[in-house]
Design a protein with these regions (language model features):
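Glycine-rich phosphate/dinucleotide-binding loop and adjoining beta-alpha-beta core of small-molecule
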Residues: 229-231
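Short acidic/polar hinge/loop motifs at secondary-structure boundaries
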Residues: 1-24
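Transmembrane beta-barrel strand/turn architecture of Gram-negative outer membrane proteins
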Residues: 16-18, 36-63, 142-215, 245-281
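Short beta-alpha junctions and helix-cap segments that line functional grooves
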Residues: 5-8, 27-31, 41
């Protein structure tokens, strides 16, 4: 076998997996060396079957929905009452006190008018991902081959976030009278990831429910007053998503694994492996 990162396991076609074995402690160390002292997860994929040419296609659809049940936040009225109880609208300075009272009156007016923004849901959506896999296999007792084409589209629950992957794999094995066995597997993957422009989710958890998302004209409000009686303001996290910025990652990886087995006799076996990988961003 060959050592791969977790991302490779995540991208595996589940229909191509034959078995999963967990090795611990001494057994893992004996086979894979000191790096496996804490254990190894061995994933065995299905070998190409001999016989007539076979073509298989699989489609997997995954639906991801955000779970906000662990968030227990105050509604607009409760948040305003908590701020009053905490003394946020009290000051020993007359000018500051007047400004704080005006802020409180404005927020109370909004609460009474029905403003109660549930900010947690604003940057989220139900994401529907799909995975396509086309596999071609065939051969005879001596030569077997397998060709794998796959495409994954994985949108995130944060709006406009995604991870898309296209991969090609080619496996060729040659068995000479059950004495010599050659195997070579070449895989090429192209991955593109996009982070959500809607920023950090904690900004939405910290936003005040008595603030509106849009003004009376339906335009997105850019910023809001802070809790203190100053000119300081904080940005509407939804407004940041309208700014022209991107956070994307794209790379192409090449991996070629070659192994050789020579069954000298019933007691001796010679095995060699060569692996090469390259990644370009």
């Amino acid at each position: 076998g060959y050592e791969v990162d977790v991302e490779k396991i995540f991208d595996l076609n589940m229909d191509r997996i034959e078995s999963v074995t967990i090795l611990k402690d001494a057994s893992a160390t004996a086979i894979y060396g000191s790096r496996a002292a804490n254990g190894v997860v061995v994933v065995t994929t299905k070998a190409p079957q001999e016989g007539q040419l076979r073509v298989s296609y699989n489609l997997n659809v995954a639906i991801s929905a955000p779970d906000l049940s662990d968030y227990h936040l105050l509604n607009a009225r409760e948040k305003l009452e908590a701020e009053v109880a905490g003394g946020l609208y009290e000051s020993e300075y007359m000018d500051t006190q007047q400004k704080l009272r005006m802020d409180y009156a404005d927020r109370l007016k909004r609460v009474k008018s029905g403003v109660d923004t549930y900010w947690l849901s604003q940057p989220l959506e139900v994401a529907v991902g799909h995975k396509h896999s086309l596999y071609v296999e065939g051969g005879d007792k001596s030569i077997r081959y397998g060709i794998d084409l796959n495409y994954q589209a994985n949108p995130g629950v944060m709006k406009k976030s995604s991870r898309d992957r296209f991969g090609v794999g080619f496996l060729l094995s040659y068995n000479l009278n059950n004495k010599l066995l050659f195997r070579n597997k070449l895989t090429v993957d192209k991955v593109k990831s996009k982070e959500s422009p809607y920023g950090s989710f904690r900004d939405y958890a910290a936003a005040n429910p008595y603030e509106r998302v849009h003004d009376d004209e339906g335009k997105l409000i850019e910023s809001y007053d802070t809790h203190v009686a100053t000119t300081a303001r904080y940005l509407n996290p939804l407004y940041e998503a309208t700014l022209n910025h991107k956070d994307e990652t794209a790379y192409t990886s090449w991996t070629d694994n070659f192994d050789f087995d020579w069954f000298i006799n019933d007691h001796f076996r010679l095995k060699a492996k060569v692996a090469y990988s390259e990644r370009t961003d």
